[in-house]
């Protein structure tokens, strides 16, 4: 389909403000209208091109020479010195170094620990019959995994909880005097200071037992492994002095890991429980067919779309599908909408754990494909395997109102009351 300028500037029948966090409380009709009527729509209020179709989000994500991340991925927010706000070759340089901490081998080694951790958390709630799934469960798994990847002690882990939530709360706030943004900046500075101390400790003791140690070694030696498996798997090295990760780059990545890696997985877990609660037949299907867990994970990521949006900046004047785009124009990609595109997914608003094929964009696509995708998949898989094995009928207590935070970036579910039959009633062996 070729768009016309008229379609690009069409007036929707309802208010669409893609920078208003409340828009994402119930955006589905707006997404459908955009996909059908103006898939490349000019948002006059925010001075953005809004992109809603799977095909177009994929195209923009794959062509960084035309749609750059280097000018920032969030509107009205300065581009941080972070891997998500870089184009190649700089992006690829950092990605090659950082990816050593997230190989399939590393994730496989973590799987048993994630299972143990999940069961420890379930132990705390199993006899209660109810919980706040976010506060009592989903918040803990990804943060503890990240903390242990980083080699943090229990006290540092507790501070990490506070810093992560405070930094994420700053999303959507642009006034530098806003107390929420000030607090987020202070939390980021405190976290960075701790990371600097840890980097110096790893440098002093030479340890490569955790992610900070591995990446500190990458900084000091500028070395990549010959096998691509990284220092967690061995120390065969090829000396490449151009591949040096600076301390500031490492700290910025760790901030991204804590904020994005924690928040997105937390929301995938919470949104996954919402999806199973809305579609109880799919819950039953997974209980009866546990071998569907891998495809269920992919469907959770598609249906939930924990990351809702990102921005790119046009690098040169060109025409895309009949619409003239100018250098400096900002393009706002709606991943949630792309993952509900009728042109790609049959019955896209249905949650189907055996959906195949499932070419979702929940982890992105192209050069910025999520570095932590393997880890996120493992966490989601293990959590729902263990959760449904022990609390077989767990479900959201109510679905008419899901409480979200003030974010236009991530789903940001803040609370989710859940109910279930106490474990001992399903399994007498668990009775005290």
Identify what each model region corresponds to.
Residues 1-432:
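Cytochrome P450
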């Amino acid at each position: 389909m070729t768009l016309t300028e008229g379609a690009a500037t069409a007036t929707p029948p309802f208010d669409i403000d893609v920078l208003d966090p409340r828009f994402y409380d119930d955006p589905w009709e707006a997404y459908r209208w955009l996909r059908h009527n103006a898939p490349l729509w000019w948002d006059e209020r925010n001075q953005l091109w809004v992109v809603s179709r799977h095909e177009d989000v994929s195209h923009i994500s794959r062509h960084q020479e035309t749609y750059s991340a280097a000018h920032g991925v969030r509107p009205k927010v300065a581009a941080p010195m972070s891997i998500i706000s870089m184009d190649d070759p700089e992006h690829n340089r950092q990605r090659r170094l950082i990816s050593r901490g997230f190989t399939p081998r590393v994730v496989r080694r973590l799987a048993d620990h994630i299972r143990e951790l999940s069961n420890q958390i379930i132990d705390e709630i199993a006899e209660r019959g109810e919980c706040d799934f976010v506060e009592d469960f989903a918040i803990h798994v990804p943060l503890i995994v990240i903390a242990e990847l980083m080699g943090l002690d229990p006290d540092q882990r507790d501070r990490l909880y506070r810093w992560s939530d405070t930094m994420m709360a700053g999303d959507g706030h642009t006034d530098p005097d806003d107390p929420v943004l000030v607090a987020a900046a202070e939390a980021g500075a405190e976290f960075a200071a701790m990371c600097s101390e840890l980097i110096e400790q790893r440098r002093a003791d030479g340890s490569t037992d955790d992610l900070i140690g591995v990446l500190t070694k990458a900084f000091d030696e500028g070395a990549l492994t010959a096998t691509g498996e990284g220092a967690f798997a061995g120390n065969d090295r090829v000396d490449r002095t151009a591949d040096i990760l600076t301390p500031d780059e490492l700290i910025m990545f760790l901030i991204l890991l804590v904020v994005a890696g924690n928040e997105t997985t937390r929301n995938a877990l919470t949104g996954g429980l919402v999806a199973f609660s809305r579609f109880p037949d799919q819950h039953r299907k997974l209980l009866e067919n546990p071998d569907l867990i891998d495809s269920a994970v992919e469907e959770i990521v598609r249906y939930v779309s924990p990351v809702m949006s990102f921005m790119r900046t046009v690098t040169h004047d060109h025409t895309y599908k009949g619409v003239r785009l100018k250098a400096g124009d900002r393009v706002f990609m709606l991943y949630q909408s792309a993952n509900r595109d009728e042109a790609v997914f049959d019955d896209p608003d249905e949650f189907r754990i055996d959906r195949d094929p499932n070419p979702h964009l929940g982890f992105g696509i192209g050069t910025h494909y999520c570095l932590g995708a393997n880890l996120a998949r493992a966490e989601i898989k293990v959590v729902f395997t263990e959760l449904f094995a022990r609390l077989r009928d767990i479900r959201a207590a109510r679905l008419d109102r899901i409480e979200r935070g003030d974010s236009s970036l991530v789903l940001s579910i803040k609370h989710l009351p859940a109910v279930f039959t106490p474990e001992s009633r399903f399994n007498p062996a668990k009775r005290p």
